[in-house]
Amino acid sequence: MSAKIIAFSAVVATASAFAPTAGFVPRLRSGATSVNMAMDKSAKAPVITIFDHRGCSRAPKEYTGAKAGGKDDEMMVKAQSVKIEVSTGTAEGVLATSLAKMTK
């Protein structure tokens, strides 16, 4: 019986954690608060490269840090932020394709 009470209490606690507060009223944001919410126009995106040299005879030159002493020495994940360059023609083609699929 106590297990049922504990399970019920957990469900109630979870539901109340995700319920909005009674005094919450959505409002329009003023100009001062929306300034920091502007879209990032830097055109940068994360680029993730995975290097897996397990079983490869080529000496890895990408990583120059200390070795772990195991199979992880032959693997590496590189994450970087790169500015994405897209031509206007490519952008127009993607837009046209997207709009054509949205009307169907």
Curated annotation (Swiss-Prot):
PTM summary: Contains one covalently linked 15,16-dihydrobiliverdin chromophore.
Modified-residue entries (5-hydroxylysine), positions: K41
Keyword Protein biosynthesis among UniProt keywords: no
Residues noted as binding 15,16-dihydrobiliverdin in the record, renumbered to the chain: C56, R58, K78
Gene (UniProt): cpeA2
Subunit structure: Heterotetramer of 2 different alpha chains and 2 identical beta chains. The subunit composition could comprise of any combination of 2 out of 4 different alpha units with an invariant beta unit.
Membrane-related topology note: Peripheral membrane protein
Name of the molecule in the record: Phycoerythrin alpha-2 chain, chloroplastic
GO biological process entries: photosynthesis
Transmembrane segments annotated in the record for this chain: none
Listed GO CC annotations: chloroplast thylakoid membrane; phycobilisome
Primary location recorded for the protein, binned into one broad class: plastid
